[in-house]
């Protein structure tokens, strides 16, 4: 049964009730946490003690010599002999709180026990005025929320007391009362920033005045301890906020839309002191001008914290580098990936999010103004700047100079840095210090051997079944990966290590050690406790006769392990492995570039052939034009004459006597033909491709049907460059037909023809 109060014994009771599977999961998880998460190593040692692995627990506690709490655990629970009397360390309560925090994250205890542990630590540190109280308060606030600091004995309710300072004679006007130093600090609460009850929404503004003397405001530690002080001179970015006027519920305090709220009358029944008045200017302040301090009249002093002159974004609320605060899932080592994949991983608990400094319209408890802030910009006088939470201001995001200093868009609602670009998941295999090759029936022995070697100081080990034997992949490919990505190959010699696959693994391992440069003596035959030399087959024994066995039965087994797996040799082989991987990547990249180069060369050759054929075609067309010009009648202009370039449409067409030149059809002039045939609006004209009669032709007699004479011909469309004229010589009659209409024209017989007939 777990203890009711937060203590180390209570944490041990919680671990005892968790179960064997959960403790094994915690063992592998806590071992891989980064050093920034304090309390993980202590809890890891406690888990080892609960699992009965006292030797490993003592090794872990021995590594924490500087931790007094770890030494206390070693003396009381690990059975470490010590002549000194166990004394309770001063930071025991803090260490217990961190342990309970990790237990809460693993769903082993409720969050109320973690809060109680942090409250006990805060009370202990506050009672002796410890210098680390500020850091403890920040950690408790980040992990347990704001309320964990509200019910401590040393923190009082912040109120406006009329007896501390003489009331100001100034009324609600544009004048500002002179600041006076606070002489007696006993009647005042601890110097802290102010916020509304139950919501940290006032973090964006450093000051918030209570609505009435009867409403308690929780004081939250937001700066280092020290006497409260009034600002001697107005800071460029420190501006008090106006108090809500004439109502019990607070109004929008970050950006008031106008000055009407400041001029509203005060309720007569309100017993509170005089309220300040915020004055605004007619024109907004320039972004380059520093904001001024508003002229207010107050009956009580308020605390001002030092802030930088330039407006900055809210800093990060936490300095803790623990994994929980970073809100990133715990990444386990490669050696425990396969083990943890088989175990049901508990869901990642939710982490308290930092509340926005300026609440949005949908979530803010304050009523939104009827007029948007863009329509009525407020001068920088009445706008408060977010305070500095720590003594050293963190790096803030640059503010655009075009943004107005009083516009809500110029201030981020949450200090949310730009997320880094997503890193591409690397397909590179991890390098292991050793890999255990075993038969399929010896998986449990291989896992035990790996844990034994890791406990002796040889970290980053692997087993063939756990890290390389991927389902769906070839067995030989998995074996080659194990040989390529490990410093030592351990052959687990048992009675089952006698099949053909095991013999093949042995042969491949020996050949790799002989042919791979720098990997000599990398094959280690391992004789576990579950086996003996008599159980080995003759073929295996004869094959490994020339190698020295690593016998787990030996009394100097630990020393042999230390001499075999030397850190210098492991680092050297990892460096060589890294060079091999880089060389392999360069070879693959060069092969890809060569393939792309050949592809580009093929495209270039194809394009060159196309250009060559096009130029040959163009030359042939020009020759045909020159030959065609020799057969044209004198005075007839070629559509593709020597004056124009290739593809230039003709300037004019020869026309029939008494007729207008015909227009091109729409589909020849660049316009697509209609979907449905359209009836002709006018009588069709002969296309320009038909030959024109020579000038010697006469008009036909009146008896012959003549084509209609159109008074207004449609405008000529752009001529197609592909049309060629048809030339007819020595014809007495020419008949033309277009769209089911035909007409003809007769001419006089040529003189040479008459001569021939006479003869």
Swiss-Prot record:
Q: Which Pfam families match?
A: RHIM, TRIF-NTD
| Stretches with biased composition (Low complexity) | 351-365
Q: Indicate the cross-link positions, Glycyl lysine isopeptide (Lys-Gly) (interchain with G-Cter in ubiquitin).
A: 229
TIR domain ranges (all copies):
430-590
User: Region (Disordered): which ranges?
Assistant: 241-296, 340-426, 642-723
What GO molecular function terms would the record report?
Answer: signaling adaptor activity
UniProt keyword Phosphoprotein present: yes
Q: Anything noted about its domains?
A: The pLxIS motif constitutes an IRF3-binding motif: following phosphorylation by TBK1, the phosphorylated pLxIS motif of TICAM1 recruits IRF3. IRF3 is then phosphorylated and activated by TBK1 to induce type-I interferons and other cytokines.
Q: How does it assemble?
A: Homodimer. Found in a multi-helicase-TICAM1 complex at least composed of DHX36, DDX1, DDX21 and TICAM1; this complex exists in resting cells with or without poly(I:C) RNA ligand stimulation. Interacts (via TIR domain) with DDX21 (via C-terminus). Interacts (via TIR domain) with DHX36 (via C-terminus). Interacts with AZI2 and IRF7. Interacts with TICAM2 in TLR4 recruitment. Interaction with PIAS4 inhibits the TICAM1-induced NF-kappa-B, IRF and IFNB1 activation. Interacts with IKBKB and IKBKE. Interaction with SARM1 blocks TICAM1-dependent transcription factor activation. Interacts with TRAF3.
Quote the protein name from its UniProt record.
TIR domain-containing adapter molecule 1
């Amino acid at each position: 049964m777990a203890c009711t109060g937060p203590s180390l014994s209570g944490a041990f009771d919680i671990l005892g009730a968790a179960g064997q599977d959960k403790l094994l999961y915690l063992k592998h998880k806590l071992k891989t946490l980064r050093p920034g998460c304090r309390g993980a190593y202590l809890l890891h040692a406690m888990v080892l003690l609960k699992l009965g692995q006292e030797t490993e627990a003592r090794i872990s506690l021995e590594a924490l010599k500087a931790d007094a709490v770890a030494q206390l655990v070693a003396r009381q629970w690990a059975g470490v002999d010590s002549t000194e009397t166990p004394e309770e360390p001063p930071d025991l309560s803090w260490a217990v709180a961190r342990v309970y925090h990790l237990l809460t994250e693993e769903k082993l205890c409720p969050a109320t026990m973690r809060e109680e542990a942090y409250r006990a630590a805060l009370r202990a540190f506050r009672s002796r005025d410890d210098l680390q109280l500020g850091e403890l308060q920040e950690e408790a606030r980040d992990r347990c929320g704001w309320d964990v600091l509200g019910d401590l004995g040393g923190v009082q309710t912040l109120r406006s007391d009329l007896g501390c300072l003489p009331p100001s004679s100034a009324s609600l006007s544009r004048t500002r009362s002179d600041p006076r130093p606070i002489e007696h600090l006993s009647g005042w609460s601890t110097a802290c920033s102010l916020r509304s009850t139950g919501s940290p929404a006032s973090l964006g503004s450093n000051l918030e005045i209570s609505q009435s003397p009867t409403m308690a405001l929780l004081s939250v530690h937001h700066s280092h301890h020290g006497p409260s002080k009034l600002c001697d001179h107005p800071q460029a970015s420190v501006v008090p906020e106006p108090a809500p006027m004439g109502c019990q519920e607070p109004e929008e305090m970050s950006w008031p839309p106008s000055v009407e709220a400041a001029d509203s009358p005060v309720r007569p029944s309100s017993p509170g002191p005089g309220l300040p008045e915020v004055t605004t200017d007619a024109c907004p302040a320039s972004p380059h001008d520093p904001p001024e301090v508003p002229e207010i009249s107050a009956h009580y002093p308020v605390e001002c914290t030092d802030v930088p002159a330039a407006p900055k974004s809210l800093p990060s609320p936490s300095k803790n580098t623990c994994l929980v605060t970073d809100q990133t899932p715990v990444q386990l080592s490669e050696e425990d990936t396969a083990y943890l994949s088989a175990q049901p991983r508990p869901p990642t608990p939710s982490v308290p999010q930092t509340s926005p400094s300026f609440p949005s319209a949908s979530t803010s408890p304050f009523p939104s103004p009827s007029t948007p802030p863009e329509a009525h910009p407020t001068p920088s006088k009445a706008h408060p700047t977010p305070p500095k939470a720590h003594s050293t201001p963190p790096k803030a995001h640059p503010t655009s100079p075009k943004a107005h200093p009083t516009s809500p868009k110029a201030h981020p609602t949450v200090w949310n840095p730009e997320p880094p670009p997503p890193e591409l998941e690397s397909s590179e295999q991890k390098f292991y210090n050793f890999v255990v090759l075993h038969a399929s029936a010896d998986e449990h022995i291989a896992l035990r051997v790996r844990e034994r070697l890791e406990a002796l100081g040889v970290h980053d080990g692997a087993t063939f079944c756990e890290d390389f034997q991927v389902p769906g992949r070839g067995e030989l490919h998995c074996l080659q990966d194990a040989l390529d990505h490990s410093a030592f190959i351990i052959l687990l010699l048992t009675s089952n290590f006698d099949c053909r696959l095991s013999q093949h693994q042995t042969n491949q391992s020996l050949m790799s050690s002989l042919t791979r440069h720098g990997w000599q003596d990398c094959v280690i035959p391992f004789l576990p406790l579950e086996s003996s030399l008599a159980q080995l087959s003759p073929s295996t024994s004869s094959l490994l006769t020339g190698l020295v066995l690593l016998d787990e039965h030996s009394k100097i087994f630990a020393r042999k392990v230390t001499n075999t797996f030397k850190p210098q040799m492991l680092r050297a082989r990892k460096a060589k492995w890294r060079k091999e991987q880089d060389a392999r990547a360069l070879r693959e990249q060069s092969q890809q570039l060569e393939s792309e180069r050949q592809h580009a060369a093929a495209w270039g050759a194809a394009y060159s052939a196309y250009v060559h054929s096009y130029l040959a075609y163009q030359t042939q067309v020009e020759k045909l034009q020159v030959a065609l010009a020799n057969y044209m009648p004198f005075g007839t202009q070629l559509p593709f004459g020597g004056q124009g370039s290739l593809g230039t449409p003709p300037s004019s067409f020869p026309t029939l006597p008494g007729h207008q030149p015909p227009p091109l059809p729409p589909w020849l002039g660049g316009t697509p033909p209609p979907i449905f045939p359209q009836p002709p609006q006018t009588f069709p004209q002969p296309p320009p491709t038909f030959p024109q009669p020579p000038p010697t032709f006469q008009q036909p007699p009146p008896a012959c049907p003549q084509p209609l004479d159109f008074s207004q011909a449609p405008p000529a469309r752009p001529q197609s460059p592909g049309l060629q004229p048809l030339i007819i010589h020595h014809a007495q009659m020419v008949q033309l037909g277009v769209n089911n209409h035909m007409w003809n024209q007769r001419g006089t017989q040529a003189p040479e023809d008459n001569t021939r007939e006479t003869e």
